[in-house]
C-alpha cells in the first residue's frame, strides 16, 4: 500500500528536488573547514551539477571540476550554463583535448570542467601554477584511469605546499576507507571529512528495480536451463566475457517485451554493450523493428555534438540508446526508464608479447554495475536488467582493476620525467605515491624502454635521475598518444611532416573524416574506396593502414576542393571590400552540404585541422632539425588536380531497410551523392609514396619496440647479416609442400621462419607466441633501431644570407615593416641597393649618410593593402621583377593582436597580387621570433592564402640586424629566437576553379 501511495513523476514533468540540495549548507561548511572533503551519494543525487554551484554562490571560486570522459565534461558544463542563463565559455567553461571553451570575453570562467588528461598536462607544464583555483573537484573517483590516479597523486603533492587549496572527491561507489587513509598523511591535524548524501524522502524518490537472468527468462517465458552457461559461458567471472549470439537475441526480445508492455512511449531504453562491433550487431537485429524505435549510438567514435542529441526527450517514437561505458557515469539522459546491462566492458592492457596495447572483454565490477544502474530512476522510475544470474553477479569484483596496474606506463613515465616541478618529476617517487602503486619493475622497464629509443638519458650517478633528451621532450609535448607521436616525428625525418602529422592525428581521434554508416560495413568500405582503394596500388597494407590512408586522402581532397574554393572566394571578397576575412569563418551549411555530398564528416575535418596547427606550433617552439627544409604537402600534387561533381540519387545499398538512427546515419537524409568516383585516384596526392613510407616506419617502430628481445647473429656495416641458411618453406610449415628436395626453401625445423606479415602492421599479430611465423625482427635493418631520432636545429650553421637572397643578383627585393631600416640597410651590404625597396610602417627621420645610396624608401605603409591595391598608381614597385618579399616582424609584446591583423592583410594582398599577375616564383620571407610565430598562427594565416612554408632557419642577427623582441624565457628545451620563414606560392588548380587570375585582375584594377 505504501508503494502505491508514493508520488510518481512522469517523463516530461518537473523534476523532484535533488537529494544533494538538502545538504547545501553542510557541504559549504565542511569544504570551508576542511582541506579534503569526500562526498558520497547515490547516482542521480545531483553531486556533479549542484556542488560546484553551491560553492560558486558562496564566492569560493574559481572552481576546477574534473570528469573521466569528454562527453560528461561537455554535457555537464552545458547543463550548468543553461541553468545559470549564461553561454558556455563565460561563467561556466570546459576544456577537452584541443577544445578550450573557457575564459571567453577576456574574463576567467568561474567554473571550469576538464578531463583528467588536460589537468595532468597543465600540471606537467606549469606545476603548482596549474592549480590556481580555490576548490578542485575530482568527480567519479571510482573510475581508475591512469590519468585520474596521477592527478590525484599530483594534487596531493601540491597540497603540501598550497595550504589554501580545497579538494573535493565525489563518487557513488568509491571505497571510502581507502581514500580517507590515502590523505591521512596530508598534514598534522588534517582530516578527511566524509559527507554521505542520504536518499530523498520516499515521497519524492523514483524507484529502481533490479532483475537478473532468472527473472528475465521468466518474464520472457524462455527456457531457464543452464542460464550461466548459455549467456555467461560459465558460473562465475572466470568464464569468457565474450558475447554469444544468444545474448544479442535475449536483448532483442527484452527490448520488444519492454516496448509492448510500457504504454508511455516517452520512456527510453539504455543498453550497455562493450564494443562498437557489439553495438552494430545489436542494431542489425533491431532492423526488423524499425517502426518502433528511434536509435541513438553512444560511442567514442561519435561526434560529441551528435552524442548530445541523446539528451533530447523523444515523444513521437521510443528512444533506444545503444552505448558503451561512455554513458556509465555523471550524465543524466532524460527519460531513461529501462537499463539493459550486458555486464561486460572493454579493457585495455599492455601485451608484452606483441609490444602494444591490446583490448579484451572483461566482466564489469559491482561498482560499474551500480553506476549503470544509476542511469535510470533519475527522471522517472526505472528497471535494470542485468544479463547475469544472481550468484554470478555476487562473484564480480567490488571495484575495477586500476588501469595503472595494467599498462606499460611508458607515456606516463616520460611525462613525469619531463615535468617542470620537482614535486612530480621523479617517476619512481611519484608512482609510489599513487593509490595503487605499480610494481617497481614495471617502472624500470618503462625507463629502460625510453632510454633505448633515446627519449631519456641514463642517470650519470647511482642517485641521479633519468633526464629527458630533446627527442623525449618533443615526444612528450606533442598532443598525441605515445606511438602516434613517435610516428609523426619519424615522418618528419623523412621530409613528409605534413602527412605524418595528419596520419598520427587519425591514429588517435574519432570520428574520422570518412562517414561510417552505422551497421553497413559494405557501405563503409565503398565510401573509403572512393578515396583510397588498396587494389589500385601494388602494395599490400594492413586494415588499419588502409583506413588511415583513406582518411588522409579524404582530408586532402577536402583541402583541395572545398577549402581552396573558399580561400579564393575570401581573396576576391578582400579585393571588393578592402577588409580581411577570416578563412575559418565560413558558413557551416555549405560545408555540411558539400561534405554530405562526398560522404565526409565536417566536424572531424575541422578538428583535425585544429590539432594539426597545434602540433605544428609545438614543433616550431622546439625547432627540430627537419624544420629547416619542409616538403610541401603531397596533396598539392598534381598541381592540376581536377574533380567534377556528378549528382545522383543514393545507391540501392543505401536504401536498405534502416532504423531511424539519430547519430551516424543522419547523412543519408539528403539522398544525393557525388557519382564522380573515385574522388581520389592512386596517382593523386603522392598516395603510393605515403603508403610506402608508412609501411617502412611501422616496421621500424615494431623493430624498435621489440629490440630488447632480439639477438642479432652478426652486425655488418650498419645492417644485420641474416643467417646463411635459407628461410623455412611456408608450405612445409603448414605440412603441404610437395616439392621435397627440389624446394628452394628450407625444410629444416631450425631454419629461420618467414616474418609474420601481421606482426609488422599497426594492428599487430593477435596470435602472439603461438603464431607459426616469426616475430623476430633480427632480420630487419638494425639501423631502424636508432634512426628517426630527431635532433634540434644547430644554431651554429647559419648561412642566412645565401638562403635569403636571390641567386646571382637576379630580381628585386621588397622589405616591409622595417621600422628602423636596419634590416634593409644590412641587406645592402650583400645585395645591389638599387634593387631593394624598403617600406616603413610610419614616418621615418634619418640622416642621409646613414642610409645606403640607391636604397628606395617608402614611408607610412602601416596598412600593407595601400602598397598592393590602393596606392599602386602612386607607389612604383616593379612587381614583375620582384623575387623576394620580406616581412621584418620585430614586434613589441603589446602589439601582438594588431600585428596578427596586419600580417593577415599582408598575406592576403601578396596572394592577390601574386595570383593575379601569375608571379608563382615569388618567395615571401617572414623574419620573426619563433614563439611569436606560433602565438600569431602565422603559418595558418599564410596557408589560407596559398602560401606554404618550405624552409625555416635561425636568423643571423649579428649579420642582418638585432631584434628587440625578447619573449619570456622558453620552457625546457624550447627555443626563443628570431627565425627566417620562407614561404612559396602553390596556386589552386586552374582546371578546377577556372581563370581566377583574370577575375582577380578585373576586380583588382576596377577598384
UniProtKB/Swiss-Prot annotation:
GO MF annotation list: ATP binding; ATP hydrolysis activity; DNA binding; helicase activity; mRNA binding; RNA binding; zinc ion binding
What Enzyme Commission number(s) appear in the record?
Answer: 3.6.4.-
Q: Which residues bind ATP?
A: 41-48
Which top EC class applies here? hydrolase
A Pfam family annotated for this chain is: Helicase_C
Q: Which InterPro entries match?
A: AAA+_ATPase, DEAD/DEAH_box_helicase_dom, Helicase_ATP-bd, Helicase_C-like, P-loop_NTPase, Znf-CCCH_4, Znf_CCCH, Znf_CCCH_sf
Enumerate the spans annotated as Helicase ATP-binding domain.
28-192
- Put simply, this protein is called Zinc finger CCCH domain-containing protein 4
